[in-house]
């Protein structure tokens, strides 16, 4: 099972970063690859089992389910039900931790999925550089005030 992983440091307190990324329906507010998001069936966005319909900037549609959300651990885990990517059984976790030296935040995003062997390397690069790093860069820019 291929795995993707990315991490970064955000120059902002962990509670502020968590507040920015916590909302399962709020991805368009901070990730440049997402045009809009809607929670299906009128559920609350922090309700385990909530399904979000994401519309990517290129018009593609993705559906994901919130599997776990912990304010104590500052983690969010979700899986992908539908999307244009050539993977299946996609499951990801986004987590933030405090860095006490300088009141900064360590952020990590990881995913595992199944894919055809010939597609694995390209999909890992896409998720690590396009999805994860794209999100980290946008968060850094936001908290830098740019």
PLM ranges: what are they?
Residues 6-8, 62-68, 90-98:
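Hydrophobic/aromatic beta-strand elements that line small-molecule binding cavities or substrate pockets
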